[in-house]
Swiss-Prot record:
Induction note: Up-regulated in galls upon nematode infection.
Source organism per UniProt: Arabidopsis thaliana (Mouse-ear cress)
Name of protein: Tubulin gamma-2 chain
One of the record's GO cellular component terms: plasma membrane
KW Cytoplasm (keyword) present: yes
Record Gene3D superfamilies: Helix hairpin bin (1.10.287.600), Tubulin/FtsZ, C-terminal domain (3.30.1330.20), Tubulin/FtsZ, GTPase domain (3.40.50.1440)
Gene Ontology terms describing biological process: cellular localization; cytokinesis by cell plate formation; cytoplasmic microtubule organization; leaf development; microtubule nucleation; microtubule polymerization; response to nematode; root hair cell tip growth
General function of this protein: Tubulin is the major constituent of microtubules. The gamma chain is found at microtubule organizing centers (MTOC) such as the spindle poles, suggesting that it is involved in the minus-end nucleation of microtubule assembly.
Lineage top rank: taxon: Eukaryota
Oligomeric form and interacting partners: Gamma-tubulin complex is composed of gamma-tubulin and GCP proteins.
Gene that encodes it: TUBG2
Disruption phenotype: Alteration of the morphology of feeding site and failure of nematode life cycle completion.
């Protein structure tokens, strides 16, 4: 029985990475740009209905909502070659089309204004599912629509569909370059609060690291957004292969996440992928074995979060959990041997209070997509060094807040009216508490953490540490 997943693409970035994701899924399942099954797509064994449903004329339609407050990207999709793929009733554009002006408060406020309209769309999609498992939100945390409206949707989904899983693919801004969004630290902090309290799993897509990988690994001198987005769609499609080509394990989202997220607050995942190739790029042909792929996944240069192992404290940083999704022609005995070799060489430093094991899910490769390598792998990992990414967000926020810079843009909206900036302070406290929790994970006493000092427990709807999230219980 399919466990359907509804995808919400919010804002410019969310719609761009969402579009790439659907292109990739169409290729892998043999679905044409118009949603019609290709003549050659005769092999069964895949579950298209997790992400698609069939219209009366048998063509496949993504279970997706395209939401934006300014029309440019969605108009591009509606006039592009995949225009007939989507259900046009599931496209929401703001009436005035002015966008959110890179202001979280504007996106959040406008989200509140159109809540009924968007929730109607979501309810309609949910009613059309036999056994809805959850939602996937694609967005960025730095702008206005993806961050503000995305935050509002996360809160609303939590209220309306409290038993359903919510996973996000969240794009973090490039912190090596000066941003064209000066209020990025404010937007990021306010969104991070919602990602901490209202999401069950956040896959962190860090633009800093994606750019670095594009330059170092793909030898692109000046990577375009389209090229980094294709890296993102590779990760998104690989992370859903076990749902779309089901085996006996990890064939639904709960199963996939339950092992990765032992405590509810530490639900931010980093990813690694190998071997990487981008179209039009000279492919390096090499022998890909399971051991080679699994070893490469642990190398810092393949990991798509920049904070990882690039600072003096990295030696204390530890893995909380690892799931490797290996695609291709794989013999399970090779997996066992590879895990043994990795253990013998002590290539991985795990936390002391949990099972020190790399989990492996084997998955079929799409028969319709030709690749030059036999085996490819995606790593989804929870690692304590992710806290440095949050610490950097905090320090950038503190710099701006100290100068009281650009706060007038926020005071125009009801949440910050009458100079009430408590939302910022509360968000900061929650992210600081999250950083502390990841640091505490590195010590063997973590299980007792937060028990003695009630002040360390989270405000709002968040779970206290050590309390299992009922949605992730089997």
């Amino acid at each position: 029985m399919p466990r359907e997943i509804i995808t919400l693409q919010v804002g410019q970035c969310g719609n761009q990475i969402g579009m790439e994701f659907w292109k990739q899924l169409c290729l892998e399942h043999g679905i044409s740009k118009d949603g019609i099954l290709e003549d050659f797509a005769t092999q069964g064994g895949d579950r298209k209905d997790v992400f698609f449903y069939q219209a009366d004329d048998q063509h496949y339609i993504p279970r997706a909502l395209l939401i934006d407050l300014e029309p440019r990207v969605i108009n591009g999709i509606q006039n592009g070659e995949y225009r007939n793929l989507y259900n046009h009733e599931n496209i929401f554009l703001s009436d005035h089309g002015g966008g959110a002006g890179n202001n979280w408060a504007s996106g959040y406020h406008q989200g509140k204004g159109v809540e009924e309209e968007i929730m109607d769309m979501i309810d309609r999609e949910a009613d059309g599912s036999d056994s809805l498992e959850g939602f996937v939100l694609c967005h960025s945390i730095a702008g206005g629509t993806g961050s503000g409206m995305g935050s509002y949707l996360l809160e609303t989904l939590n209220d309306r569909y409290s038993k359903k899983l919510v996973q996000t693919y969240s794009v973090f801004p490039n912190q090596m370059e000066t941003s064209d969004v000066v209020v990025q630290p404010y937007n990021s902090l306010l969104t991070l609060k919602r990602l901490t309290l209202n999401a069950d799993c956040v896959v962190v897509l860090d633009n800093t690291a994606l750019n670095r990988i594009a330059v170092e690994r793909l030898h692109l001198t000046n990577p375009t957004f389209a090229q980094t987005n294709s890296l993102v769609s590779t990760v998104m499609s690989a992370s859903t292969t076990t749902l779309r080509y089901p085996g006996y394990m990890n064939n639904d989202l709960v199963g996939l996440l339950a092992s990765l997220i032992p405590t509810p607050r530490c639900h931010f995942l980093m990813t690694g992928y190998t071997p990487l190739t981008v179209e039009r790029q000279a492919n390096v042909i090499r022998k890909t074995t399971v051991l080679d792929v699994m070893r490469r996944l642990l190398q810092t240069k393949n990991i798509m979060v920049s904070s990882y192992a690039r600072n003096k404290e990295a030696s204390q940083a530890k893995y909380i959990s690892i799931l490797n999704i290996i695609q291709g022609e794989v013999d399970p005995t090779q997996v066992h041997e590879s895990l043994q070799r990795i253990r013998e060489r002590k290539l991985v430093n795990f936390i002391d209070w949990g099972p020190a094991s790399i989990q492996v899910a084997l998955s079929k490769k799409s028969p319709y997509v030709q690749t030059s390598h036999r085996v490819s792998g995606l790593m989804l990992a929870s690692h304590t060094s992710i806290r440095h990414l949050f610490s950097r967000c905090l320090s950038q926020y503190d710099k701006l807040r100290k100068k009281q810079a650009f706060l007038d843009n926020y005071r125009k909206f009801p949440m910050f009216a009458d100079n009430d900036l408590s939302e910022f302070d509360e968000s900061r406290d929650i992210i600081e508490s999250l950083v502390d929790e990841y640091k505490a994970c590195e010590s063997p006493d973590y299980i007792k953490w937060g028990m003695e000092d009630p002040g360390q427990l989270m405000t709002g709807e968040g779970n206290a540490s050590g309390v299992a999230d009922p949605k992730l219980a089997f």
